[in-house]
Amino acid sequence: MKRWLTILIIISSTLTFAEKRALVIGIGTYAPDSGWDAINGDNDIALVQEMLQANGFSLNHIATLQNEQATYQNIQQALCALCQSAQKDDVIYIHFSGHGQQITDINHDEEDGYDESWVPYDAPIQPSDTYYGERHLTDDELNHSLSSLSQKVGTNGKITVISDACHSGTGTRKIGETNIRGTSAKFLLTETTKAQYTPQQEHWLHLSACMDGECNRQFIHDGKAYGSLTYALYLLRDQLSTSSAKELIKLIETQLNKLVRRPQTPQLEGSEACKKATIL
């Protein structure tokens, strides 16, 4: 009997159980000298937390970075911590609500010559003699972190990235219209201190708020502004664990047309296998 008990204890100590883990970043106000307009990305955090909890995420496993907490360094550290804690078969959800910007592609993997980037709290809108884009979080850098995460969770795990930002869609912004995320001004580099990464095959889903050339408008509810993509996901929270990503993107587009009543086409990137699965 003691022998069986010992074997049982050894076996049970090696078992790991899949968890649902999330990182939610919301920026409404940027550093005073950054040049960025205030938006309401920080309002999205509570919606995302409620949405995730409705889909089995424990609040203890939902890390958040809000406004001045969401510096480039803190975001990178949070991604690293998420990777360190991730286990095989885990479900990973990463959500960014804030400004986005196109930045010069330094490793020449983009056809148009520009990387997409998330704009952390401390990233200026323009280059200068002392700033060369090192605090813009490019898609190459994010993909590097996601590749590490993908290795940790394995083929049965899930990784979903939501970008409620806009990288190039404000070229049609009307004078005085501030309810839009992102900028049409590209961040042009002649030199950079950023590391270069080799493009990796993507084993994750990336859902963004709109196509290039479209505006990502915020949605106003009871006098409070939210990201339109975030709010659409919140309204569809009961279907996030049951509908495939392909089915979900159609539902999201329908919701966006109702919410903002302007052309806004959400984009879904990832492998075909990921698109056929649920996002959570």
Regions found by a protein language model. Name each.
Residues 4-12:
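Sec-dependent N-terminal signal peptides
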Residues 14-280:
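Cysteine endopeptidase catalytic domains of the caspase/legumain-like
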